[in-house]
Every structure is written in C-alpha cells, then in structure tokens.
C-alpha cells in the first residue's frame, strides 16, 4: 500500500471533521481555510529530488488525541462545484523537462499542457522536481490520477507521484513559506520496505507524523535502505529520537538519528550545478557506522561517468594519501577508493564532495573495505614511500623475503626500501656469480653493491657451500660475492671471506659448517700474500661457489715444487664472465702444457664426460654444484 493511498482530496472530507483535541469549531476552520483559497503553497523538500508531502494532501485518519502542537487540518483550494483539471506531478528527475513529460502523457493517450517549475534562486532554468499537468477535463485528470499514481514511469526508474494541484493550478507560485516541520533520519530498513510501511510505523505512535520517504537509487531504482520521517511537532520528533531507536519495522530494528534538511534555495543552487545534495541526512547511513570504524578507510564515489577508469580516479584521489585499492564495478556508475590511513579518506571526502570529475559531479560517502583487515593492517605497519633508515641484517639481505641479486637485481643499501623477492631461477651459485648483474660484476668494471659487514664461520672444505648441493628444498639461489681486501685474509691459516653463499649455508640446516678447518695449502698463497690481486679475487669468488672434490695436494709434488708452481699461476682473470663450459674449453687448450709440466699428469682420464672447472696452478680440480648449458 503506497503512502499516497493514505491521502484524499479535501473536497471529499466532511467539513465538520476536526481533531478531538482542537477547540476551534469546524466552521471557523473552514472559513480560515477558505480565506486563503488562492494562497500558493509550495511543497517542502528534504532532498533535491523529492517532496515528502504533496502540497494539497490531507490524511484520512480516525479521530485520535493529537499533540497540542500538531498542525490542524486545512482545506485545499478548489473546493466548490467545479473540480480542477490540473494535477501536481512530483519526484521528477533532473533530466525530465517539459518536452519529455508532454511526450510521456501523449504516449498514454492523454493530451496535456505542462508547466515545469523552475528555481527563482538560480540564474539557470533549473528543475526543482515537480510540475503541473493540465488535462482536457476534470474527468480526464481524475482518471489519470486513479490509474497512474504510484505506477512506474515508462522509460524511467521511478514512479508517478500525482495529486490534485492547489488553488492557482498552472499559476502556482513556488518558494512560499509554510509551517515548520521536523525530520528524523531512519536507517537499516529492509530493501522491500515502502514509504507507506515506514509512515504507518511512526503514525501509529505519533499523530504529528506527516510523511515518510524512502530514498531510492536514481540509477537502479532500488531502495537505499534509509529514509526520512517528518513531524509537525518538534516535541514528538525529539521523543521519537529517544524512544524509537531499535524499534522493529517489518522485523528489522530501526536506526534513528537527527536529519539536517537543507533550505530550498540551497537545494536549487546545488541542482543548478548538478550536485547531489550533501547534507548530513544524505551521508548519515554510512557516517553512523563506517566512520566510527577505525579500520574503515574506503571512500564510496557515486555519480561517476561511464567512461571513467580506475586510473582517472587515482589521479583525482592520490593527493590525499596512499591508495591501496581502486574498484569501479561495471555499469554501476560508482566506485570505491581505499586508502592506507583513515585520515586520508576523511580528507578526501571533505575536499572532493561534489567535485566535477569528468563530465559529472561526484558524491562521496563512507564505503566498506574492499581489502581484508589483515592486508590493511599489514600495509599500515609497513614503512611509508618517502623513505626510511634502518640497517639491513644478513637475513634481510639474503633471506627468503628479500631480493636475490642476479634474479632480481637492485640496490640494497641501507636507505632504500626492501624489494619483493622474484622467482628464483635454477642457476647455481657459480653461474649466478658470473652474470653481469651479480655482485661479482663489480670486479669487471661495473658498479659494486655495498652490503653491511657479515661475519660467517670459516670456510669448510668438507661442507657443501651451496645449499643446492645438499638437496635442500629451500628454493634459494645463493650468490657469491667478491671479498673486500679489508675483510679477507689469512688468519691462522684460515680464510674469512664475506660471502652471501656462506650466509645461505648457515641458514640452511642441511649444510653443516665445520668452524675450524683449514683450506688446502695450495689455496693459501692466493688468499694470503696476493689477495689484492685481480686473479685472486676471481679465484676466491669461484671457490666460494664450488664444492671441493680432492682436498689434498698432488702426491707427485713436494712442498718446494708446489710453492714454486704456486708462485706463478696462470692468469684466469680473463675468464671472469665465462661459464663453466668456457673454463672447460680453456682446460682443453692448456692440457698439453699441463702434461708437459708434470703436475697435470693423467688429468684427462680423471675428468668425467661433463663440464668441470679447474685451476691450472695445481692438480686439484673443482666440481661445480650443478651443470649448466651455455644459455642457462
């Protein structure tokens, strides 16, 4: 049952019907009413699009005790022998002009004259949401009222709101004052609740309740699940605010708060700009709940043009703070912008309310977080984009959650924010160390990467330095690092290289490091006296990423002969960016020289048919942790 069914024309009323509490005789009330027959009356508007009460409506109610402050019933103009041929038509959309309304009634086989009321407070011809429709006869007007009132308008997402026009009819003058009315906001309504349901809920308790209006979405025509109820008595309005909180309407508890209506002049001015009203009553449903939630950082953006994208919204809302997520549902004409901080969302709502974005003015309100609370709290705990100062530990540099140099290169100094880890390729430490973007590339004329000092245990000859050698499932691809001269040297026959590979082996529990094992003597000259040389840097880099197979010096060499050979090693620096296959190729080229010198005897027979790396200064050879093709 619609709310308009609760009204009837005053001419149908018995003139002797007056409220029981009134002490004024019926005749005096009629005379007072008839004295103002031609006084134009304008409807009161809570929002820019709709009237809560038609100016000519009277309520048909049983006699009851009314509040002394209730406005007495008044007769309407036009009471007499002749019925009016003009109807009042309200709740018009801003785009409905006189041409549309006239064509609308013509499609219904009703020839009419239409006069759309325009705002006098604005220089532009702005619609103020109602008009007057004059029919060919009073019977035609009455037939249209009974047939089309509260039915859907063809081609629009709204219904006909019809009633008899007041005194002057087409000569109706707007913006005339009337008795004050007091509104309350009602939220948490069911989607199926209608105006009449909300009205009867309050009218059954408060006789001064004059109207109820549920707000609908202008695009979809669906209920927004909140509305406004108006009273002629301020006392009953205040009583409803206190005692109707949680009152059941169709089984749903109501949420009551004060509505702050805007003046008609202000509404007309906003309508001239195409701005949706932004009064407290409009923002009330979201502000009461969502704005009190400290974790809610999402802004609802309504009135978006269909050609706007997420990138356009980002440009408009990015100045107010860091944006976590932007979403524009397809075909809804709205969007959601989620910030990392609540203060940024508040600033955006206060600043961008009613702003022109694209070709339309937007309306803002509190929405609901599109990201889970866990993701939001994690984002708020991170460091801001402006930068931060902290010292990176070994685990942060080489751990799971940091970038693996060579797989995802980038600077890792102490003043930059951490990078996300990239997918790790199945390269070994030796191969990664030979890539141009690895740490070792610094010794080839490239920019070096400075890390904080790390002090791992001494290098073990029996331990698998790379975690990939021990069958670990960690998925890490540790990289070798060149050893700064200040941090590398022989201390009691032990070498302490500053290597990321050692740190990775320390993290991996399957690679057990023996803390006090000396390197083979044939490596000590390179790590001792000549550790500043280019060839030594290259040698130690490769040793840090390979597993020792034969730790002892050749039996064919005594100590003096070994020292003599060790004092003049082949220069392997030219191979600093070669792969293991390239090293094998160099070995084959030098085999004749090795066999002639006497300490590379039977080297060919000792090499299995796969790629190996060797150091030509001794009979030792190093087994790579993983064979690679040239293009891997």
UniProtKB/Swiss-Prot annotation:
SMART domains: RRM (SM00360). SUPFAM superfamilies: RNA-binding domain, RBD. PROSITE patterns: RRM. GO terms for biological process: 3'-UTR-mediated mRNA stabilization; cellular response to oxidative stress; positive regulation of gene expression; regulation of mRNA stability involved in response to oxidative stress. Residues 85-167, 182-261, 297-369 form the RRM domain. The modification Phosphoserine is found at residues 42, 54, 67, 69, 291, 455. Residues 456-476 are annotated as: Disordered. GO terms for cellular component: cytoplasm; cytoplasmic stress granule; cytosol; ribonucleoprotein complex. InterPro entries: Nucleotide-bd_a/b_plait_sf, RBD_domain_sf, RBM42_RBP45_47-like, RRM_dom. Keywords: Cytoplasm, Phosphoprotein, Repeat, RNA-binding. It is found in: Cytoplasm. It holds the Pfam family RRM_1. The keyword Phosphoprotein applies. The keyword Ribosomal protein does not apply. Its main location: cytoplasm. One of its GO terms (molecular function) is RNA binding. Interacts with cip1 and cip2. This is RNA-binding post-transcriptional regulator csx1. It comes from Schizosaccharomyces pombe (strain 972 / ATCC 24843). The gene is csx1.
């Amino acid at each position: 049952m619609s709310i308009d069914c609760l009204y009837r024309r005053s001419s149908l009323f018995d003139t002797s019907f007056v409220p029981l509490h009134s002490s004024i005789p019926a005749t005096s009330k009629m005379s007072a009413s008839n004295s103002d027959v031609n006084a134009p009356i304008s409807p009161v508007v809570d929002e820019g699009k709709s009237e809560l009460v038609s100016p000519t409506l009277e309520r048909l109610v049983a006699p009851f005790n009314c509040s002394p402050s209730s406005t007495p019933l008044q007769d309407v103009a036009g009471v007499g022998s002749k019925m009016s041929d003009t109807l009042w038509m309200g709740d018009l959309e801003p785009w409905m002009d006189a041409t549309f309304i006239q064509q609308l009634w013509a499609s219904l086989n009703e020839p009419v004259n239409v006069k759309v009321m325009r705002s006098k407070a604005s220089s532009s011809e702005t619609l103020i949401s109602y008009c007057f429709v004059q029919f060919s006869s009073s019977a035609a007007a009455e037939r249209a009222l009974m047939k089309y009132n509260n039915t859907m308008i063809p081609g629009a997402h709204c219904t006909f709101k019809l009633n008899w026009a007041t005194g002057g009819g087409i000569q109706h003058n707007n913006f005339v004052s009337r008795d004050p009315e007091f509104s309350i906001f009602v939220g948490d309504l069911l989607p199926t609740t209608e105006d009449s349901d909300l009205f009867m809920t309050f009218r059954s308790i408060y006789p001064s309740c004059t109207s109820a209006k549920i707000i609908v979405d202008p695009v979809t025509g669906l209920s927004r699940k909140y509305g406004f109820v108006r009273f002629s008595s301020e006392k009953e309005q205040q009583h409803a605010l206190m005692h109707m909180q949680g009152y059941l309407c169709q089984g749903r508890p109501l949420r009551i708060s004060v509505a702050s209506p805007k003046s008609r002049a202000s509404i007309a001015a906003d309508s001239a700009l195409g701005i949706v009203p932004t009064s407290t009553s409009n923002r009330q449903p979201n502000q009461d709940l969502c704005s009190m939630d400290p974790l809610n950082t999402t802004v609802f953006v309504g009135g978006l043009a269909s050609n706007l994208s997420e990138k356009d919204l980002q440009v408009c809302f990015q100045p107010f703070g860091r944006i976590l997520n932007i979403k524009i549902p397809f075909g809804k004409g709205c969007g959601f912008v989620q910030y990392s901080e609540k203060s940024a969302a508040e600033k955006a709502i206060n600043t961008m309310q009613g702003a022109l974005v694209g070709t339309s003015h937007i309306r803002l309100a509190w929405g609901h977080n599109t990201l889970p609370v866990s993701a939001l709290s994690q984002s708020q705990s991170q460091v801001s984009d402006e930068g931060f100062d902290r010292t990176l530990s070994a685990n942060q540099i080489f751990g799971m959650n940091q970038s693996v140099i060579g797989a995802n290169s980038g600077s890792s100094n102490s003043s930059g924010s951490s990078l996300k880890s990239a997918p790790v390729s199945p390269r070994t430490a030796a191969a990664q160390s030979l890539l141009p973007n690895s740490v070792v590339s610094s010794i080839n004329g490239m920019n070096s990467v400075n890390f904080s000092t790390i002090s791992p245990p001494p290098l073990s000859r029996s331990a698998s330095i790379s975690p990939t050698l021990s069958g670990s499932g960690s998925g890490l691809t540790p990289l070798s690092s060149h050893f700064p001269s200040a941090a590398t040297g022989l201390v009691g026959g032990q070498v302490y290289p500053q290597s990321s590979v050692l740190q990775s082996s320390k993290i991996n529990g399957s690679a057990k490091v023996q803390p006090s094992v000396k390197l083979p003597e044939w490596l000590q000259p390179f790590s001792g006296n000549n550790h500043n040389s280019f060839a030594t840097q290259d040698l130690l880099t490769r040793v840090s990423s390979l597993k020792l197979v034969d730790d002892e010096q050749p039996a064919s060499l005594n100590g003096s002969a070994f020292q003599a050979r060790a004092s003049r090693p082949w220069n392997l620096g030219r191979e600093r960016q070669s792969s293991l296959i390239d090293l094998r190729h160099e070995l084959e080229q030098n085999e004749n020289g090795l066999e002639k010198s006497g300490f590379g005897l039977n080297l060919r027979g000792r090499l299995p048919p796969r790629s190996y790396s060797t150091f030509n200064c001794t009979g030792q050879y190093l087994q790579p942790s993983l064979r690679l093709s040239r293009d891997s």
